[in-house]
């Protein structure tokens, strides 16, 4: 459900949201489990490979429904959590800065940012969790507390952080905790993860402005950016590449075509 906006002026975020969101929830929950090796992380012991696959798939879908709390992954440890909770130590290219956002399924969120003039690169991945080097399957359990995020590289001479914040607020409903549309789970929570004090200040000010436009409470978390784990290549620029069905969507700068998120 989109945010309930108190303002319907021609400059309100509602109009921008309608252009970027393309209606309703993302519905990206059907990504096939085809990615990196699981490294035996939390499937219970079973007698056959087929049973293991079935159990794992069931747990992944429980995670999608927010029911994946299994008491933590056996791969999780204090050392693993400390690594995952460390700062993002990557560095952007000269003249660029990083920004990081969680706003539901990262496929559609990434495409929205790809279209922003001045954005030079986007990556989808996992962050803010308690497991070092998680896989998509790990995150889908809901037990690692990672968020699906987009790390945006932007040219500071051509794009301002405020421009990215505008896209962030327009792209999703920031009032639904751990949910966007049909996608339910902590990996779909709303978050702005800042790299500099200036980004933090801008994020908090923008939240205050957005809250005045809404009649529901914003639940967006604003936290320091933590270690970024790039998602499997399958997920990168997923919609621009056409996804599973080959329906490519434009990543052209300034494009306002509705974003259709599909598995």
UniProtKB/Swiss-Prot annotation:
Query: What does the record say about tissue specificity?
Result: Expressed in roots, stems, leaves and flowers.
An example of a Gene Ontology BP annotation on this entry? cellular response to oxidative stress
Q: Which UniProt keywords apply?
A: Chloroplast, Oxidoreductase, Plastid, Transit peptide
Q: Name one GO cellular component term.
A: chloroplast
Asked if the Swiss-Prot or TrEMBL record annotates the protein with the keyword Heme, the reply is no
**Induction text:** By salt, mannitol, cold, high temperatures and methyl viologen.
Which EC number(s) are documented for this chain? Answer: 1.8.4.11
Highest taxon above the source species: Eukaryota
Instruction: Give a single Pfam family match.
Output: PMSR
Localized where? Plastid, Chloroplast
What reaction does this enzyme carry out catalytically?
L-methionyl-[protein] + [thioredoxin]-disulfide + H2O = L-methionyl-(S)-S-oxide-[protein] + [thioredoxin]-dithiol; [thioredoxin]-disulfide + L-methionine + H2O = L-methionine (S)-S-oxide + [thioredoxin]-dithiol
Task: Tell me the residues of the organelle transit peptide.
Answer: 1-75
Keyword set includes Chloroplast:
yes
Top EC group: oxidoreductase
The entry lists its GO molecular-function terms as: L-methionine-(S)-S-oxide reductase activity; peptide-methionine (S)-S-oxide reductase activity
Q: Which family does it belong to?
A: Belongs to the MsrA Met sulfoxide reductase family.
Give the HAMAP family listed for this entry: MsrA (MF_01401)
Record's function text = Catalyzes the reduction of methionine sulfoxide (MetSO) to methionine in proteins. Involved in abiotic and salt stress responses. Plays a protective role against oxidative stress by restoring activity to proteins that have been inactivated by methionine oxidation. MSRA family specifically reduces the MetSO S-enantiomer.
Q: What is this protein called?
A: Peptide methionine sulfoxide reductase A4, chloroplastic
Q: Please tell me the species this chain comes from.
A: Oryza sativa subsp. japonica
The taxonomic lineage of its organism, from the top, reads: Eukaryota, Viridiplantae, Streptophyta, Embryophyta, Tracheophyta
């Amino acid at each position: 459900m989109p945010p309930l906006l108190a303002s319907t002026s021609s400059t309100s975020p509602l109009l921008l949201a309608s252009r970027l969101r393309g209606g309703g929830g993302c519905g990206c929950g059907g990504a096939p489990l085809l990615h990196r090796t699981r490294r035996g992380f939390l499937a219970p012991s079973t007698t056959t490979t087929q049973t293991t696959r079935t159990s794992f798939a069931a747990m992944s879908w429980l995670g999608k429904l927010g029911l994946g709390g299994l008491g933590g992954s056996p791969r999780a440890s204090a050392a693993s959590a400390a690594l995952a909770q460390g700062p993002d130590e990557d560095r952007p290219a000269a003249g660029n800065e990083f920004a990081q956002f969680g706003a539901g399924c990262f496929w559609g969120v990434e495409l929205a940012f790809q279209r922003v003039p001045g954005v030079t690169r986007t990556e989808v991945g996992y962050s803010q969790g308690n497991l070092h080097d998680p896989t998509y399957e790990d995150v889908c359990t809901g037990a690692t507390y990672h968020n699906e995020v987009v790390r945006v590289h932007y040219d500071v001479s051509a794009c301002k952080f405020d421009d990215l914040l505008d896209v962030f607020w327009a792209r999703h409903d920031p009032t639904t905790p751990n949910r966007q549309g049909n996608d339910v789970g902590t990996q779909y929570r709303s978050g702005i993860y800042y790299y500099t004090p200036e980004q933090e200040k801008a994020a908090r000010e923008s939240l205050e402005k957005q809250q005045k436009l809404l009649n529901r409470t914003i639940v967006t978390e604003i936290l320091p950016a933590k270690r970024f784990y790039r998602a499997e290549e399958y997920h990168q620029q997923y919609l621009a590449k056409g996804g599973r069905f080959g329906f490519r969507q434009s990543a052209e700068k300034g494009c306002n075509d509705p974003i259709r998120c599909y598995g």
